[in-house]
């Protein structure tokens, strides 16, 4: 099964407090038929950490996961949100942007 959003993709947030922010996908989480993505610089919270042996405590920024339905891949040509399609080129299945037809990977 091919994934429409993969690590390293440039995406834009469609809804929520970080609407219209652009970032790169750090990690894709699939758990119990729910798909979420962690995006750099988006959905950031403060994490208060207690000092432990080997590491000091403090307040750190942490990116939380966003549901995959709230993000869209950026079109490589026009830099707008786009849907993703699949086609076979030279016997290899590739993703392409539906807006411009450009191959994503």
Swiss-Prot record:
One of its GO terms (biological process) is translation. The keyword Lyase does not apply. The keyword Ribosomal protein applies. InterPro entries: Rib_uL2_dom2, Ribosomal_uL24, Ribosomal_uL24_CS, Translation_prot_SH3-like_sf. One of its GO terms (molecular function) is rRNA binding. GO terms for cellular component: ribonucleoprotein complex; ribosome. Keywords: Ribonucleoprotein, Ribosomal protein, RNA-binding, rRNA-binding. PROSITE patterns: RIBOSOMAL_L24. Gene3D superfamilies: 2.30.30.30. It comes from the Bacteria. Belongs to the universal ribosomal protein uL24 family. Part of the 50S ribosomal subunit. HAMAP family: Ribosomal_uL24_B (MF_01326_B). One of two assembly initiator proteins, it binds directly to the 5'-end of the 23S rRNA, where it nucleates assembly of the 50S subunit. This is Large ribosomal subunit protein uL24. It comes from Wolbachia pipientis subsp. Culex pipiens (strain wPip). The lineage of its organism: Bacteria, Pseudomonadati, Pseudomonadota, Alphaproteobacteria, Rickettsiales.
